């Protein structure tokens, strides 16, 4: 009597077929996405490097924001150098973003808040720059510690606030910039850069600071 041999089905379990189909569909989907878009090699490499080094997409975005601020800083510094303004305008990076420090004589007469005509070319350059970026802008007015008491400006608080507001008013009046992006702050003599112990130091403390805000710091 012949022994019957058991037949084994070569057919895979149903769940494996379904899983294989799903993987195939996902692969086709990403191939289509890749073929329909142009890949920025630099950004792609940034993402790869970040993920392979234990980073995340959030850290990639933060790195890109930092690079954009560095580019803004370089552009402003180039303008200052080209126009020989480094002795009265300083540009730097700190935790707030890109900070521009304009000494009083760039924009104002001492004790006044009306913008001088000689200061408008730099404000125009800033207006064109701000039109190309989405960052919020803070404008701070600062004075030295010598008291002022006039009808228009009873104290340094009013003078510093009027100067900050005047800069914003000029930019929003001359360029298509939303006022919602701006914040005016008047600090009076409460935040000196240096001690008010000499005429040179007094002059350094009379200033306007324009901060191109870092989105990560907001």
UniProtKB/Swiss-Prot annotation:
TM region positions: 15-35
NCBIfam families per record: PRK06925.1
Protein's organism: Priestia megaterium (Bacillus megaterium)
UniProt domain OmpA-like: residue ranges: 95-216
Extracellular side of membrane: 36-218
Keywords: Cell membrane, Membrane, Transmembrane, Transmembrane helix, Transport
One GO cellular component term: plasma membrane
Record PROSITE patterns: OMPA_2
Kinase as UniProt keyword: no
Chief place of localization: membrane
InterPro entries: Bact_OuterMem_StrucFunc, MotB-like_N_dom, OmpA-like, OmpA-like_sf
Protein family: Belongs to the MotB family.
Membrane topology: Single-pass type II membrane protein
Function: May be involved in some transport function.
Positions on the Cytoplasmic side per record topology: 1-14
Origin: domain of life: Bacteria
Protein name, UniProt field: Uncharacterized 24.6 kDa protein in ccpA 3'region
Subcellular location: Cell membrane
SUPFAM superfamilies xref list: OmpA-like (SSF103088)
